[in-house]
UniProtKB/Swiss-Prot annotation:
Transmembrane segments: none annotated. Keywords: DNA-binding, Repressor, Transcription, Transcription regulation. InterPro entries: LysR_subst-bd, Tscrpt_reg_HTH_LysR, WH-like_DNA-bd_sf, WH_DNA-bd_sf. Regulates the expression of genes involved in peptidoglycan (PG) degradation. Could play a role in switch control between recycling and degradation of PG peptides. Negatively regulates the expression of the ycjY-ymjD-ymjC-mpaA operon by binding to the PgrR-box. In addition, other genes are predicted to be under the control of PgrR, including genes related to membrane formation and function. This is HTH-type transcriptional regulator PgrR. It comes from Escherichia coli (strain K12). PROSITE patterns: HTH_LYSR. Residues 4-61 form the HTH lysR-type domain. GO terms for molecular function: DNA binding; DNA-binding transcription factor activity; sequence-specific DNA binding.
Amino acid sequence: MKREEIADLMAFVVVAEERSFTRAAARLSMAQSALSQIVRRIEERLGLRLLTRTTRSVVPTEAGEHLLSVLGPMLHDIDSAMASLSDLQNRPSGTIRITTVEHAAKTILLPAMRTFLKSHPEIDIQLTIDYGLTDVVSERFDAGVRLGGEMDKDMIAIRIGPDIPMAIVGSPDYFSRRSVPTSVSQLIDHQAINLYLPTSGTANRWRLIRGGREVRVRMEGQLLLNTIDLIIDAAIDGHGLAYLPYDQVERAIKEKKLIRVLDKFTPDLPGYHLYYPHRRHAGSAFSLFIDRLKYKGAV
């Protein structure tokens, strides 16, 4: 087989995996028109249609899926081989792209970076704050950080933090207008300041203990915010009850700006995990970052 034919087949694999000529062209750094001609040339050579094209997507035909299943692993083996060669460099380098929730960034990732980045000056880290359940593969992240149990089962998940004590809090001003709840059922009479979840377009449900078992409660409220700091400010201003990690409101509680309630009904949340796809080649920079983050305390 000629070298050009091999290159054409590799280009087809990228189009079939991306399900898009636009994304494939960007990944291969070539024009969409040239990529379309390559695929058409392969189809003419084989006498088979490999892709079904629509205005919004590209879907492999049965023949295309078969070809992808054979060639895809070969391409990834080549990528892994090239990546392993780059790892032979004396100093790990590159950019590690992580999608994470705000609390994990503040309490785990940023503290870990204080020494990590000083020790590895040629490694860059990009953090993107996002409360959605991000697909790290399609969004081009190296890994994501979410609570244990939230990531897909086909991901490798590594625990990077302890369980998280939660707190329900309200301001003295709020409780001057509303009774202090003493049971989960009484929360129906209260306003909540909720965390916005972009994946579902709804508010975060509160994990509480009711009747001896954990339940997820949807709270009603007029405010839907997307950062912890804004929720804390709104709670201090008396807009309602907030459900937050205890370490983020501990100071405000000690300063009597907030009052904690229902602490016996708020179970700890499972600790944060770093997750990434099984097929991802763990380069030296990424491996070092994983080793730095691994939780070494008692689970």
